[in-house]
Protein backbone atom coordinates (compact mmCIF):
# COMPACT_ATOMS: atom_id res chain seq x y z
CA UNK A 1 0.00 0.00 0.00
CA UNK A 2 1.33 3.42 -0.97
CA UNK A 3 2.22 5.66 1.95
CA UNK A 4 1.96 9.38 1.39
CA UNK A 5 3.32 12.46 3.10
CA UNK A 6 2.10 16.03 2.84
CA UNK A 7 4.39 18.48 1.07
CA UNK A 8 3.96 22.20 0.56
CA UNK A 9 5.46 25.32 -0.97
CA UNK A 10 4.20 28.53 0.60
CA UNK A 11 4.87 32.06 -0.62
CA UNK A 12 3.53 35.47 0.27
CA UNK A 13 0.39 35.02 -1.84
CA UNK A 14 -0.33 31.34 -2.36
CA UNK A 15 0.09 28.01 -0.59
CA UNK A 16 0.63 25.00 -2.86
CA UNK A 17 0.10 21.59 -1.25
CA UNK A 18 0.50 18.07 -2.60
CA UNK A 19 1.06 14.44 -1.69
CA UNK A 20 4.46 12.77 -1.92
CA UNK A 21 4.88 9.02 -2.35
CA UNK A 22 7.40 8.32 0.41
CA UNK A 23 8.89 5.33 -1.43
CA UNK A 24 9.38 6.92 -4.87
CA UNK A 25 9.25 10.67 -4.23
CA UNK A 26 6.52 11.10 -6.86
CA UNK A 27 4.39 14.22 -6.36
CA UNK A 28 0.64 14.10 -6.98
CA UNK A 29 -2.65 15.85 -6.21
CA UNK A 30 -1.11 19.33 -6.17
CA UNK A 31 -3.49 22.17 -5.41
CA UNK A 32 -2.96 25.90 -4.89
CA UNK A 33 -4.80 27.95 -2.26
CA UNK A 34 -4.89 31.70 -1.80
CA UNK A 35 -3.25 32.59 1.48
CA UNK A 36 -5.63 35.52 1.84
CA UNK A 37 -8.59 33.15 2.22
CA UNK A 38 -7.37 31.35 5.34
CA UNK A 39 -6.46 32.51 8.86
CA UNK A 40 -3.48 30.17 9.19
CA UNK A 41 -1.32 27.65 7.37
CA UNK A 42 -2.74 24.93 9.59
CA UNK A 43 -6.23 25.79 8.36
CA UNK A 44 -5.11 25.38 4.73
CA UNK A 45 -3.53 22.01 5.51
CA UNK A 46 -6.73 20.78 7.16
CA UNK A 47 -8.82 21.85 4.17
CA UNK A 48 -6.44 20.08 1.78
CA UNK A 49 -6.44 16.82 3.76
CA UNK A 50 -10.25 16.90 4.06
CA UNK A 51 -10.70 17.57 0.34
CA UNK A 52 -8.46 14.65 -0.60
CA UNK A 53 -9.78 12.29 2.09
CA UNK A 54 -6.28 11.23 2.95
CA UNK A 55 -4.58 10.51 6.26
CA UNK A 56 -0.89 11.34 6.56
CA UNK A 57 1.57 11.16 9.44
CA UNK A 58 4.47 13.11 7.98
CA UNK A 59 4.85 16.47 6.31
CA UNK A 60 7.36 18.97 4.99
CA UNK A 61 6.44 22.51 3.99
CA UNK A 62 8.77 25.05 2.40
CA UNK A 63 8.18 28.70 3.27
CA UNK A 64 9.67 31.86 1.79
CA UNK A 65 11.21 33.20 4.99
CA UNK A 66 14.15 32.45 7.31
CA UNK A 67 13.62 29.39 9.54
CA UNK A 68 15.70 29.85 12.68
CA UNK A 69 13.74 28.03 15.38
CA UNK A 70 10.33 26.73 16.41
CA UNK A 71 8.50 30.02 15.83
CA UNK A 72 7.92 30.89 12.18
CA UNK A 73 6.74 34.37 11.18
CA UNK A 74 6.30 34.76 7.45
CA UNK A 75 8.01 37.74 5.84
CA UNK A 76 5.31 38.63 3.30
CA UNK A 77 2.25 37.33 5.12
CA UNK A 78 0.52 37.64 8.49
CA UNK A 79 0.78 33.92 9.22
CA UNK A 80 2.91 33.00 12.25
CA UNK A 81 3.00 29.71 14.12
CA UNK A 82 4.90 27.25 16.33
CA UNK A 83 6.13 24.22 14.39
CA UNK A 84 5.77 21.97 17.45
CA UNK A 85 2.22 23.16 18.13
CA UNK A 86 1.17 22.73 14.50
CA UNK A 87 2.67 19.23 14.43
CA UNK A 88 0.74 18.32 17.59
CA UNK A 89 -2.53 19.82 16.34
CA UNK A 90 -2.32 17.91 13.04
CA UNK A 91 -1.34 14.65 14.76
CA UNK A 92 1.82 14.28 12.65
CA UNK A 93 4.79 12.11 13.59
CA UNK A 94 7.14 14.37 11.61
CA UNK A 95 6.64 17.95 10.47
CA UNK A 96 9.53 19.74 8.80
CA UNK A 97 9.30 23.46 8.02
CA UNK A 98 12.13 24.53 5.73
CA UNK A 99 13.22 27.59 3.77
CA UNK A 100 11.90 27.72 0.22
CA UNK A 101 15.38 27.61 -1.30
CA UNK A 102 16.34 24.71 0.94
CA UNK A 103 13.51 22.91 -0.84
CA UNK A 104 14.63 24.04 -4.29
CA UNK A 105 18.19 22.90 -3.58
CA UNK A 106 16.97 19.49 -2.38
CA UNK A 107 15.02 19.10 -5.62
CA UNK A 108 18.21 19.20 -7.70
CA UNK A 109 19.22 15.54 -7.14
CA UNK A 110 15.70 14.55 -8.24
CA UNK A 111 15.64 16.52 -11.49
CA UNK A 112 15.89 14.87 -14.90
CA UNK A 113 17.59 16.28 -18.00
CA UNK A 114 14.27 17.47 -19.43
CA UNK A 115 13.84 19.68 -16.37
CA UNK A 116 17.01 21.67 -17.15
CA UNK A 117 18.31 24.09 -19.79
CA UNK A 118 22.09 24.58 -19.78
CA UNK A 119 23.80 27.94 -20.27
CA UNK A 120 27.47 27.35 -20.96
CA UNK A 121 30.19 25.49 -19.13
CA UNK A 122 30.97 21.81 -19.31
CA UNK A 123 29.76 18.81 -17.33
CA UNK A 124 29.07 18.98 -13.58
CA UNK A 125 31.58 17.23 -11.33
CA UNK A 126 30.08 14.58 -9.05
CA UNK A 127 30.55 15.24 -5.36
CA UNK A 128 31.35 18.94 -5.76
CA UNK A 129 29.23 21.74 -4.23
CA UNK A 130 26.17 23.10 -6.00
CA UNK A 131 24.66 26.60 -5.87
CA UNK A 132 21.07 27.55 -6.60
CA UNK A 133 19.56 31.01 -6.79
CA UNK A 134 16.47 32.59 -8.22
CA UNK A 135 14.73 35.89 -8.70
CA UNK A 136 11.05 36.29 -7.98
CA UNK A 137 9.43 38.53 -5.40
CA UNK A 138 12.88 38.46 -3.80
CA UNK A 139 16.24 36.79 -4.45
CA UNK A 140 16.69 33.34 -2.94
CA UNK A 141 20.03 31.57 -2.52
CA UNK A 142 21.18 28.19 -1.20
CA UNK A 143 24.03 25.73 -1.62
CA UNK A 144 24.01 21.95 -1.66
CA UNK A 145 26.74 19.47 -0.74
CA UNK A 146 26.86 15.65 -0.77
CA UNK A 147 28.39 14.02 2.32
CA UNK A 148 28.28 10.33 3.31
CA UNK A 149 25.36 9.47 0.99
CA UNK A 150 23.35 12.43 2.28
CA UNK A 151 22.51 15.71 0.61
CA UNK A 152 22.96 18.68 2.93
CA UNK A 153 21.37 21.99 2.02
CA UNK A 154 23.11 25.14 3.22
CA UNK A 155 20.43 27.85 3.28
CA UNK A 156 21.05 31.48 4.01
CA UNK A 157 20.03 34.98 3.04
CA UNK A 158 22.52 35.45 0.22
CA UNK A 159 20.11 37.65 -1.69
CA UNK A 160 20.76 40.40 0.84
CA UNK A 161 24.51 40.71 0.28
CA UNK A 162 25.67 44.07 -1.08
CA UNK A 163 25.06 44.81 -4.75
CA UNK A 164 28.58 44.98 -6.20
CA UNK A 165 28.70 47.02 -9.44
CA UNK A 166 31.45 46.22 -11.92
CA UNK A 167 30.88 48.74 -14.70
CA UNK A 168 30.22 52.46 -15.04
CA UNK A 169 26.56 51.78 -15.78
CA UNK A 170 26.18 49.56 -12.72
CA UNK A 171 27.99 52.10 -10.53
CA UNK A 172 25.52 54.73 -11.72
CA UNK A 173 22.62 52.43 -10.82
CA UNK A 174 24.06 51.95 -7.32
CA UNK A 175 24.52 55.69 -6.78
CA UNK A 176 20.93 56.49 -7.73
CA UNK A 177 19.37 53.66 -5.72
CA UNK A 178 21.52 54.34 -2.67
CA UNK A 179 20.27 57.94 -2.64
CA UNK A 180 16.70 56.62 -2.65
CA UNK A 181 16.75 53.59 -0.35
CA UNK A 182 20.08 53.54 1.50
CA UNK A 183 21.53 50.03 1.55
CA UNK A 184 21.34 48.42 -1.90
CA UNK A 185 21.38 44.63 -1.71
CA UNK A 186 21.56 42.26 -4.65
CA UNK A 187 17.84 41.64 -4.21
CA UNK A 188 17.17 45.33 -4.90
CA UNK A 189 18.19 44.75 -8.53
CA UNK A 190 17.66 40.98 -8.98
CA UNK A 191 13.95 40.46 -8.38
CA UNK A 192 10.64 41.62 -9.80
CA UNK A 193 10.82 44.89 -7.84
CA UNK A 194 14.55 44.97 -8.68
CA UNK A 195 13.80 45.07 -12.40
CA UNK A 196 11.62 48.11 -11.74
CA UNK A 197 14.49 49.68 -9.76
CA UNK A 198 16.86 49.14 -12.70
CA UNK A 199 14.41 50.73 -15.12
CA UNK A 200 13.82 53.73 -12.85
CA UNK A 201 17.53 54.28 -12.24
CA UNK A 202 18.32 54.10 -15.97
CA UNK A 203 15.68 56.71 -16.78
CA UNK A 204 16.66 58.97 -13.88
CA UNK A 205 20.32 58.81 -14.93
CA UNK A 206 19.26 60.71 -18.07
CA UNK A 207 17.42 63.31 -15.96
CA UNK A 208 14.05 62.06 -17.15
CA UNK A 209 10.95 61.01 -15.23
CA UNK A 210 10.28 57.23 -15.21
CA UNK A 211 6.81 55.84 -15.81
CA UNK A 212 5.06 53.88 -13.08
CA UNK A 213 5.67 50.44 -14.60
CA UNK A 214 5.28 46.93 -13.20
CA UNK A 215 7.88 44.20 -13.82
CA UNK A 216 5.46 42.65 -16.33
CA UNK A 217 5.22 45.95 -18.25
CA UNK A 218 9.00 46.30 -18.46
CA UNK A 219 9.45 42.74 -19.71
CA UNK A 220 6.70 43.05 -22.32
CA UNK A 221 8.02 46.35 -23.67
CA UNK A 222 11.57 45.05 -23.76
CA UNK A 223 10.56 41.94 -25.70
CA UNK A 224 8.44 44.01 -28.10
CA UNK A 225 11.41 46.37 -28.55
CA UNK A 226 9.04 49.27 -27.94
CA UNK A 227 10.96 50.91 -25.07
CA UNK A 228 14.74 51.33 -25.12
CA UNK A 229 14.83 51.99 -21.36
CA UNK A 230 12.98 48.74 -20.65
CA UNK A 231 15.29 46.83 -22.98
CA UNK A 232 18.34 48.32 -21.26
CA UNK A 233 16.90 47.37 -17.86
CA UNK A 234 16.21 43.78 -18.89
CA UNK A 235 19.63 43.44 -20.53
CA UNK A 236 21.34 44.74 -17.40
CA UNK A 237 19.23 42.41 -15.25
CA UNK A 238 20.59 39.43 -17.22
CA UNK A 239 24.20 40.60 -16.91
CA UNK A 240 23.90 41.16 -13.15
CA UNK A 241 22.25 37.74 -12.80
CA UNK A 242 25.38 36.35 -14.42
CA UNK A 243 27.75 38.31 -12.18
CA UNK A 244 25.89 37.18 -9.06
CA UNK A 245 25.89 33.53 -10.17
CA UNK A 246 29.61 33.76 -10.83
CA UNK A 247 30.13 35.12 -7.32
CA UNK A 248 28.32 32.07 -5.90
CA UNK A 249 30.50 29.80 -8.02
CA UNK A 250 33.67 31.42 -6.70
CA UNK A 251 32.54 31.41 -3.07
CA UNK A 252 31.88 27.68 -2.82
CA UNK A 253 33.77 26.28 -5.81
CA UNK A 254 30.50 25.00 -7.25
CA UNK A 255 31.88 22.61 -9.84
CA UNK A 256 28.70 20.59 -9.30
CA UNK A 257 26.87 23.34 -11.15
CA UNK A 258 24.96 26.56 -10.59
CA UNK A 259 21.18 26.34 -10.90
CA UNK A 260 18.68 29.13 -11.54
CA UNK A 261 15.15 28.81 -10.16
CA UNK A 262 12.33 31.31 -9.75
CA UNK A 263 9.58 32.50 -12.01
CA UNK A 264 11.15 35.51 -13.72
CA UNK A 265 13.73 34.17 -16.18
CA UNK A 266 11.41 31.69 -17.99
CA UNK A 267 9.22 34.65 -19.01
CA UNK A 268 11.94 35.95 -21.33
CA UNK A 269 13.88 32.77 -22.06
CA UNK A 270 14.94 33.58 -25.63
CA UNK A 271 16.05 37.07 -24.59
CA UNK A 272 18.02 35.55 -21.72
CA UNK A 273 19.74 33.07 -24.05
CA UNK A 274 20.99 35.92 -26.25
CA UNK A 275 21.90 38.21 -23.34
CA UNK A 276 25.19 38.94 -21.62
CA UNK A 277 24.35 36.50 -18.82
CA UNK A 278 27.18 34.03 -19.42
CA UNK A 279 29.63 36.84 -20.09
CA UNK A 280 28.73 38.33 -16.72
CA UNK A 281 29.08 34.92 -15.06
CA UNK A 282 32.63 34.48 -16.39
CA UNK A 283 33.72 38.12 -15.94
CA UNK A 284 35.94 37.34 -12.96
CA UNK A 285 39.25 38.84 -14.04
CA UNK A 286 42.13 36.60 -13.02
CA UNK A 287 39.67 33.83 -12.14
CA UNK A 288 37.81 33.71 -15.44
CA UNK A 289 39.36 30.32 -16.21
CA UNK A 290 38.24 29.03 -12.80
CA UNK A 291 34.54 29.55 -13.57
CA UNK A 292 34.71 28.97 -17.34
CA UNK A 293 33.87 25.26 -17.14
CA UNK A 294 31.20 25.51 -14.44
CA UNK A 295 27.78 24.73 -15.97
CA UNK A 296 24.73 26.87 -15.29
CA UNK A 297 21.26 25.36 -15.55
CA UNK A 298 17.81 26.92 -15.61
CA UNK A 299 15.29 24.75 -13.75
CA UNK A 300 12.11 24.35 -15.80
CA UNK A 301 10.35 21.81 -13.55
CA UNK A 302 6.82 22.96 -12.66
CA UNK A 303 7.11 22.40 -8.90
CA UNK A 304 10.70 22.21 -7.65
CA UNK A 305 9.60 23.42 -4.21
CA UNK A 306 7.22 20.49 -3.78
CA UNK A 307 9.72 18.03 -5.24
CA UNK A 308 12.44 19.28 -2.90
CA UNK A 309 10.18 19.28 0.16
CA UNK A 310 9.45 15.64 -0.55
CA UNK A 311 13.13 14.84 -1.03
CA UNK A 312 14.07 16.58 2.22
CA UNK A 313 11.42 14.67 4.16
CA UNK A 314 12.26 11.31 2.57
CA UNK A 315 15.92 11.74 3.45
CA UNK A 316 14.95 12.72 7.01
CA UNK A 317 12.96 9.49 7.22
CA UNK A 318 16.02 7.46 6.18
CA UNK A 319 15.68 7.13 2.42
CA UNK A 320 18.77 7.52 0.21
CA UNK A 321 18.13 9.97 -2.64
UniProtKB/Swiss-Prot annotation:
One GO process term, biological-process aspect: glycolytic process
Coiled-coil regions, chain positions: none
GO CC annotations, alphabetized: cytosol
Catalytic activity: D-glucose + ATP = D-glucose 6-phosphate + ADP + H(+)
Assigned keywords, A-Z: ATP-binding, Cytoplasm, Glycolysis, Kinase, Nucleotide-binding, Transferase
Entry-linked Pfam families: Glucokinase
InterPro entries for the chain: ATPase_NBD (IPR043129), Bacterial_glucokinase (IPR050201), Glucokinase (IPR003836)
Domain of life: Bacteria
Cell location: Cytoplasm
EC number(s) recorded for this UniProt protein: 2.7.1.2
Residues spanning the membrane: none
Cleaved signal peptide residues: none
Positions of ATP binding: 8-13
GO function terms (MF aspect): ATP binding; D-glucose binding; glucokinase activity
Similarity comment: family membership: Belongs to the bacterial glucokinase family.
Listed name of the protein: Glucokinase
Upper lineage: Bacteria, Pseudomonadati, Pseudomonadota, Gammaproteobacteria, Enterobacterales
Amino acid sequence: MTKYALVGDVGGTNARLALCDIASGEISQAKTYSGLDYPSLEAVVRVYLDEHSVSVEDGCIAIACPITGDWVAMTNHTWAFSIAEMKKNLGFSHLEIINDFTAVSMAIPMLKKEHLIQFGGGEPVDGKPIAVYGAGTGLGVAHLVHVDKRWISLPGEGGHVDFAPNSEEEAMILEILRAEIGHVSAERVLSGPGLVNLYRAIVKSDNRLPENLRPKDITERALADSCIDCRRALSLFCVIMGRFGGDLALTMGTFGGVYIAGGIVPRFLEFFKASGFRGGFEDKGRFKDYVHGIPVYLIVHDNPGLLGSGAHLRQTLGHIL
